[in-house]
Amino acid sequence: MKLKTMTMEWTGDSLILIDQRRLPFEEVYVTCADYRAVALSIKEMVVRGAPAIGATAAFGYVLGAKEILKKSHNYEQVVMQMKNVKETLAKTRPTAVNLFWALERMEKRLIRHGKYEGLVKVLEDEALKIAKEDIEVNKAIGRNGAQLLQDGFTVLTHCNAGALATVDYGTALGVLRAAKEQGKKIKVYADETRPYLQGARLTAWELMKDGFDVTLISDNMAGWVMKQGKINAVIVGADRIAANGDVANKIGTYMVAVLANRHGIPFYVAAPLSTIDMSIKSGKEIPIEERSHEEVLTCGGKRVAPNNVNVYNPAFDVTDHELVTAIITEKGVVYPPYEENIKKLFEEGI
């Protein structure tokens, strides 16, 4: 079976990823023929966005199994060697919980199968299931979130939580897409999202392709456009949500949440249940990835800072649950108190 979306294509023998580092100026694709290439693509942000990383890792796991099964026909040995594949993929990005969720799911499927025969097909089917479920989940998130947006609303978003950050459709941008599909006129302000410029490079490009009225602003303009009354709601995605509703997302999200709170603007987080980590009580326990100093020292490949200056470059921050108006999931919209209602969500659904 095969899969093809804007973000990725699974051919059965390789995983082809759109190189998000090159957008919007070039549409270049990277072909990953083994799990090491998949791991490198995740680490170097050829692919990014928590749900997309999870699905990518699942296909990387399949490629690892294909490689190992060519050398070994002993099921127990395969299981042991697949632990190395899982570890290689898992250590690429520490913050996005979907990565670990997808790999755990693949490993459980491996163990549940319990034999060498038919193993690759079973794992491939599971990876495809993860990918296709993501699309269905995102559309459900979109439908649930669209009810929060009125016709004529202007929405601010940060980073990119669209089709490029998922297998397809998107979480935060999926809400905007669903609202548009319902006939609502929605305008969008997109933060540029320094230092990696996901808002400028990816969100603006993606929304323009879909015919949205989108305005790009630098990150330090967000407070001013809010004060001017231009923004009706903020919608962002998430890389990990703690059991109490604290949200780890792209650096700068916390700043936007504080500003929205100050101006009385609802701040919504759109994310699948797979992004909620019930093993983590609060955002204080979420590991925050730090990336290369060069991302801050340069812009568009040109150096913008003096030599030898100190640099701090966390890729994510944590927004306190008190600043979150609601969390939009595929099962419905969750409101405070989050610790209680998130638990109910997993136990009963909404």
From Swiss-Prot:
Q: Which Gene3D superfamilies match?
A: translation initiation factor eif-2b, domain 1 (1.20.120.420), Translation initiation factor eif-2b, domain 2 (3.40.50.10470)
A biological process (GO) of this protein is:
L-methionine salvage from methylthioadenosine
| List of catalytic residues | D239
What EC number(s) has UniProt assigned to this enzyme? 5.3.1.23
Which Pfam families does the record associate with it? IF-2B (PF01008)
Q: Where does substrate bind?
A: R48, G49, A50, R93, Q198, N249, K250
InterPro entries, from UniProt?
IF-2B-related, IF-M1Pi, IF_2B-like_C, Initiation_fac_2B_a/b/d, M1Pi_N, NagB/RpiA_transferase-like
Q: Which reaction does it catalyse?
A: 5-(methylsulfanyl)-alpha-D-ribose 1-phosphate = 5-(methylsulfanyl)-D-ribulose 1-phosphate
Q: What class of enzyme is it?
A: isomerase
Q: Annotated site (Transition state stabilizer), which positions?
A: C159
> Carries keyword Isomerase?
yes
- Going by the entry's taxonomy, the superkingdom of the source organism is recorded as Bacteria
Q: Which GO terms describe its molecular function?
A: S-methyl-5-thioribose-1-phosphate isomerase activity
Listed pathway(s)? Amino-acid biosynthesis; L-methionine biosynthesis via salvage pathway; L-methionine from S-methyl-5-thio-alpha-D-ribose 1-phosphate: step 1/6
Keywords in alphabetical order, please: Amino-acid biosynthesis, Isomerase, Methionine biosynthesis
For this chain, the family text in UniProt reads: Belongs to the eIF-2B alpha/beta/delta subunits family. MtnA subfamily.
Question: Briefly, what is this protein's role?
Answer: Catalyzes the interconversion of methylthioribose-1-phosphate (MTR-1-P) into methylthioribulose-1-phosphate (MTRu-1-P).
Q: What is this protein called?
A: Methylthioribose-1-phosphate isomerase
| Gene name per UniProt | mtnA
